[in-house]
Amino acid sequence: PVEILRDAWGVPHIYARNMHDLLFGQGFVHAQDRLWQMEFQRRLISGRLAEVLGQPVLDIDRHMRILGMRRVAEQEAGLLKGDPRAKVEAYAAGVNAGITRQPLPVEFTLLRYRPEPWTLADSLSWAKMMAWSLSVNWETELLRARLIEALGPELAAELEPRWPDHWPVVVPSAVATVTDSRSI
């Protein structure tokens, strides 16, 4: 059994007796809060946006199919065994429970379709897309390396934006320690 409680700010708190139930709950919460984002990314990664958005995104689909992230994720899904596989499957089962047990986001109504069941390969694809999207600054890193080579590290550092030492990295009022559900 899993219990999902939301605090006054809508933040979900998942209580479970084992990892399977916890991951099921996490998948369910993700479906509640982010189903359209998950579906859009799944279609983007798979090169299947044009199926619902039409001709204007066909070039994006072609590009994503050439990159082949979905194809690799499907191959990896076939290789995943034992506990790691069970964990990702528990998460997917939670997403699917969320899809079937609650109203769909308005985007599905507007585009007149229902999402397909979430799969292990969908989760692996998502991880690949996230890694790719977080690594797109390679051009900036290459430029930085060229500047260091041409100017030297000290002079190149002068071109970097400065972050004053007295400015916080984390806003103190946003930091909270939760010791039990009453402290929220």
Q: Each PLM stretch: what is its role?
A:
Residues 2-184:
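Substrate-recognition/specificity elements adjacent to catalytic centers across diverse enzyme folds
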